[in-house]
């Protein structure tokens, strides 16, 4: 368990780190914490990871994060424009770490991490592996 946590902490910076902490000179995560701390009645903050006018081939798959305080817990929602559903689920681990860091700064427990993917897809090269995973899943109402 400890090794997994250390790996997660090392991987959190990853490719989204600059967009979270230095998007055109703005630390968006710091902004979220400061906003929710200064105006707790607000109960929500959104950040975008896109830059207006950036080339289409440079757009990140993760486009936005929403932070909401509900029931004295911090709920985070991640919005992906596209995602390889076979290989990308491990990206949720660093997202949870972002949520835990923000909730810790706010002195709140973390609530659920919600993820929305607009265009889920599977690469053709992964089709056989995906089929074997799906074949191993039992039918919901099978006796």
Which residues make up each language-model segment?
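Terminal, non-catalytic protein-protein interaction segments that mediate quaternary/complex assembly
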Residues: 1-143
């Amino acid at each position: 368990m400890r090794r997994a946590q250390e790996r997660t902490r090392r991987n959190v910076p990853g490719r989204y780190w600059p967009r979270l902490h230095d998007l055109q000179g703005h630390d968006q995560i710091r902004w979220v914490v400061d906003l929710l701390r200064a105006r707790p009645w607000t109960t929500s903050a959104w950040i975008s990871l896109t830059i207006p006018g950036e080339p289409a081939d440079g757009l990140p798959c993760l486009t936005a994060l929403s932070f909401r305080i509900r029931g004295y817990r911090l709920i985070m929602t991640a919005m992906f424009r596209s995602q390889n559903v076979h290989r990308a689920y491990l990206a949720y681990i660093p997202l949870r770490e972002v949520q835990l860091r923000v909730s810790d700064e706010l002195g709140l427990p973390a609530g659920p991490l919600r993820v929305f993917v607009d265009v889920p897809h599977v690469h053709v090269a992964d089709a056989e592996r995906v089929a074997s995973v799906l074949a191993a899943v039992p039918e919901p109402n099978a006796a």
